[in-house]
């Protein structure tokens, strides 16, 4: 599991930062990639990575402001040229389906694969697929905006080989069944329950994506115990009043949430163009005073998310 940031800027593209998009790479887990927001020129950014659009199966849109959706029609069109790509699902606020369909219709663009739209209107579970669940909750922005919480199911514990030694079970299907927690019957009639021979479950990983919003209680619910929290940081910590007036957040507000909700790593994104170059480091340094494991991400940065217990 890995995050790759395709755009980390706010409002408009700059020479240093493109507008919002981040890819959650689940290649080892599902052989899929999920995108969160698709700002203008996201597909150009993808060309500079090893991401293949045929692997993109789900797109989650936080809200319908242009810097988060203007790249969507072009990306969907280009995906048609990737061969047999399979269906794609887009999750987003009311209006995203209309935006996509009108854009494709007016440009007379035909896509070669089915697109399913899931409209976000209320908090809760929106996706459950092959060991992963995605939850959403409303944020506080000028227009309807949603945050996302991706939760991986727990993994079975290790098979306790020493505990099984007395049964002299050879390598083969029976051990595989026991490792899955199944019940098996040995040649002598002994019945073994696989769950009795497994170590403690390994908790799944949690990734939370919070784009445009000002401080609001729903962020805490989405961020709780996250391995990685991606949080918008449009303004510096000493500009909380301005952030509130413009329905955005500061780096310090993001850090406080990370500390309060037992987050492991905080990634600051959605950086205003007013913080160019080294000025952006101000946001990171302010946040680190509150939550040390903070990183200010740049376009194309990659964040590995190891299994719990395997961190180096």
From Swiss-Prot:
Active site, per annotation: 67 (proton acceptor)
Keyword list, A-Z: Endonuclease, Hydrolase, Metal-binding, Nuclease, tRNA processing, Zinc
Domain of life: Bacteria
Binding-site positions, Zn(2+) 2: 67-68, 212, 270
Bound cofactor: record note: Binds 2 Zn(2+) ions.
GO molecular function terms listed in the Swiss-Prot or TrEMBL record: 3'-tRNA processing endoribonuclease activity; zinc ion binding
Reaction catalysis annotation: Endonucleolytic cleavage of RNA, removing extra 3' nucleotides from tRNA precursor, generating 3' termini of tRNAs. A 3'-hydroxy group is left at the tRNA terminus and a 5'-phosphoryl group is left at the trailer molecule
EC nos: 3.1.26.11
Cofactor(s), by name: Zn(2+)
Record flagged with keyword Cell membrane: no
Statement: the UniProt record of this protein carries the keyword Secreted: no
InterPro entries registered for this protein in UniProt: Metallo-B-lactamas, RibonucZ/Hydroxyglut_hydro, RNase_Z/BN
Residues noted as binding Zn(2+) 1 in the record, renumbered to the chain: 63, 65, 141, 212
Subunit annotation: Homodimer.
Family membership noted in the UniProt record: Belongs to the RNase Z family.
Function recorded in the entry: Zinc phosphodiesterase, which displays some tRNA 3'-processing endonuclease activity. Probably involved in tRNA maturation, by removing a 3'-trailer from precursor tRNA.
NCBIfam families, per database record: PRK00055.1-3 (NF000801), RNase_Z (TIGR02651)
Protein name: Ribonuclease Z
């Amino acid at each position: 599991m890995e995050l790759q940031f395709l755009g980390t800027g706010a409002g408009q593209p700059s020479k240093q930062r493109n507008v919002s998009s981040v890819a959650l790479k689940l290649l080892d887990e599902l052989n899929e990639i999920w995108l969160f927001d698709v700002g203008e020129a996201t597909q150009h950014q993808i060309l500079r990575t090893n991401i293949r659009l045929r692997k993109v199966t789900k797109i989650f849109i936080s809200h319908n402001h242009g810097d988060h959706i203007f790249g969507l029609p072009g990306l969907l069109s280009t995906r048609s040229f990737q061969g047999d790509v399979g269906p794609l699902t887009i999750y987003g606020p009311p209006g995203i389906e209309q935006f996509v369909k009108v854009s494709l219709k007016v440009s007379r663009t035909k896509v070669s694969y089915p697109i399913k739209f899931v409209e976000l209107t209320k908090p809760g579970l929106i996706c459950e697929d092959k060991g992963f669940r995605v939850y959403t909750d409303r944020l506080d922005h000028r227009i309807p905006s949603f945050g996302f919480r991706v939760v991986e199911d727990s993994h079975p514990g290790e098979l306790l080989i020493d505990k099984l030694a007395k049964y002299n079970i050879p390598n083969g299907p029976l051990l595989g069944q026991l490792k899955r927690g199944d019940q098996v019957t040995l040649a002598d009639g002994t019945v073994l329950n696989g769950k009795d021979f497994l170590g403690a479950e390994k908790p799944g990983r949690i990734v939370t994506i919070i784009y445009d919003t000002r401080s609001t209680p729903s962020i805490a619910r989405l961020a709780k115990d996250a391995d990685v929290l991606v949080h918008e940081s449009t303004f510096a910590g000493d500009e909380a009043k301005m952030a509130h007036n413009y329905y955005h957040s500061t780096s310090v507000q993001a850090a406080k949430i990370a500390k309060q909700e037992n987050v492991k790593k905080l990634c600051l994104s959605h950086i205003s163009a007013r913080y160019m170059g080294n000025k952006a480091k101000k946001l990171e340094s302010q946040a680190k005073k509150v939550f040390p494991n903070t990183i200010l991400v740049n376009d194309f940065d990659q964040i590995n998310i190891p299994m719990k217990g395997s961190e180096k």
